[in-house]
Amino acid sequence: MRLSQFHLHTTKETPSDAELTSHRLMLRAGMIRKLASGLYTWSPLGLRVLRKVERIVREEMDRAGAVEFQIPTIQPKELWEQTGRWQKFGPQLLKIKDRKDQTFCYSPTAEEAACDFARSELSSYKQLPVNFYQIQTKFRDEIRPRFGVMRSREFLMKDAYSFHLHDECLVREYENMKSAYSRIFTRLGLDFRMVQADSGAIGGDASQEFHVIADSGEDALVFSTGSDYAANMEAAIAADPAPRAAASEAMRKVDTPTQKTCEDVAALLGINLQRTVKSVALIAGEGEAQQFVLVLVRGDHEVNEIKLAKVAGLDEQRFASEAEIAEHLGSVPGFLGPIAPAKAIRVVADREVAAMSDFVVGANEAGFHLAGVNWGRDLAEPEVADIRNVRAGDRALDGGELKIARGIEVGHVFQLGRTYARALDATVLDENGKAAVMAMGCYGIGISRVVAAAIEQNHDDAGIIWPDAMAPWQVVVCVINPKGDAAVADAATNLLQELRDAGLDAALDDRGLRPGAMFADMELIGIPHRVVVSERGLAAGTYEYRSRRASEAESLDKATLLQRLQG
């Protein structure tokens, strides 16, 4: 490839709306261009990187025994209604109508369509197990698309769907896909972690995420120092709290006229924030099933909405209004508590709160809190659940200490069980000739997201630092004055061919730019290895070589250069 014949358009300007480093560098490097909110055109340069990721993903999926197919991105409403996700998926599901007034959606994921394909193609247990995968565009109508392709509305995804007669077979394929994903991200040259996760809108019995480690990551990842335990914040669990200590104080009412937060109350009373209790008023359910719920967490903790939604009857909830708070508690926000409510209410306390004694909580009276409060003596024992986010320093289940890092989710694997297959009547005849609902797994990798995540992990002030496997070219041969010196141009062309013959993905920068501008472009677009061919170097029998990760260039003869690059 000669760059004089390639579209390479870099810019020095930093886009004002680019918040993340990856977004800024992808725009400056000319990898993507914005078409509309959350929609990006991939340039020839960006597409080379995208295709590198695709190739590795495809190779490892094939190696793992999966077979490629392709599902339409436009899918009929009826399929999604059968699984209940037409409404459940929410406004992220882009709904459209054709000229015949038939309703479709633009696929954000494809469990329904994959299951429909399987039920039409598979009739006997002898055809199982099977794992179908595709690399296809998806669309989610994000309310606030941002961060470039990290959270765009349209994105490229590898999604796979496996079908099984028995659960044991599903578990084996789940482990097979986890291994395949580990190989993929290792080959891509990324620092990644696999963590336990919540299944979210996809559903299922078990799921794990793959995260690229990056300080800018949106997700908090929790690790234990005592074992290989790892989970995202939604699913992370700390060890049980220590047993509750005996009460040592009498309950008393304290004046807190303007102190509405646990932090302010703790400061006023001169106590540790850990001795306070935060009360969150919610309305759960709808219609006749609607109930007022007071959720309690320690003052220095935060409610985990995913865990809370798993508590019986709390899968759907909202914050209570001030009128609803007044009706049920006879109080106002900032002074809420479980003692003496105006009406009977449901109280759900986090495990840490249930283990507290002599704590401080709202008095259900404006301007007052209660101190020295104890369970059993001052108020009834609560309903107890794990409903908080863990914190760095918490004790882990294995006895170690929990640590927190940041990550960017790039892959997710699920054991779906039979939820989708049962809803869509996807059955095969088993060994006894009886209809059996197939067990299902699904496995996704955000291919366009991987590109952005790799940049977040691999960059410096000058630009991108691609791992070799993802770079648009592994090596670029830079020619000094290609039009003015035929010998230099010929030597560069010959070197390019030798690099290709050695199995390296190489290009020739023969655009005729000044050396400084040419080198700046190579650093910006992240070329791992740069070789300079110049008149002075040829006279000395050397080439100037610089690794993108090195601070200085070095002069090497051709044999040493080739050995280094093949390395």
UniProtKB/Swiss-Prot annotation:
Q: What is known of its domains?
A: Consists of three domains: the N-terminal catalytic domain, the editing domain and the C-terminal anticodon-binding domain.
The entry assigns this protein to a family as follows: Belongs to the class-II aminoacyl-tRNA synthetase family. ProS type 1 subfamily.
Q: Which UniProt keywords apply?
A: Aminoacyl-tRNA synthetase, ATP-binding, Cytoplasm, Ligase, Nucleotide-binding, Protein biosynthesis
* Quaternary structure and partners: Homodimer.
What EC number(s) does this enzyme carry? 6.1.1.15
User: Which GO biological process entries does UniProt record here?
Assistant: prolyl-tRNA aminoacylation
The record's subcellular location field reads:
Cytoplasm
Q: Report which superkingdom the organism of origin falls in.
A: Bacteria
Give the chief site where it resides: cytoplasm
Which GO terms fall under molecular function for this chain's record? Answer: aminoacyl-tRNA deacylase activity; ATP binding; proline-tRNA ligase activity
InterPro entries for the chain: aa-tRNA-synt_IIb, aa-tRNA-synth_II, aa-tRNA-synth_II/BPL/LPL, Anticodon-bd, Anticodon-bd_dom_sf, Pro-tRNA-ligase_IIa, Pro-tRNA-synth_IIa_bac-type, Pro-tRNA-Synthase_IIa_type1
Q: What is this protein called?
A: Proline--tRNA ligase
GO CC annotation terms, alphabetical: cytosol
What SUPFAM superfamilies does this protein's entry cite?
Answer: Class II aaRS ABD-related, Class II aaRS and biotin synthetases, YbaK/ProRS associated domain
Reaction catalysed by this enzyme: tRNA(Pro) + L-proline + ATP = L-prolyl-tRNA(Pro) + AMP + diphosphate
Q: One Pfam family from the UniProt entry?
A: HGTP_anticodon
Role played? Catalyzes the attachment of proline to tRNA(Pro) in a two-step reaction: proline is first activated by ATP to form Pro-AMP and then transferred to the acceptor end of tRNA(Pro). As ProRS can inadvertently accommodate and process non-cognate amino acids such as alanine and cysteine, to avoid such errors it has two additional distinct editing activities against alanine. One activity is designated as 'pretransfer' editing and involves the tRNA(Pro)-independent hydrolysis of activated Ala-AMP.
Q: Which HAMAP family match?
A: Pro_tRNA_synth_type1
Gene of origin? Answer: proS
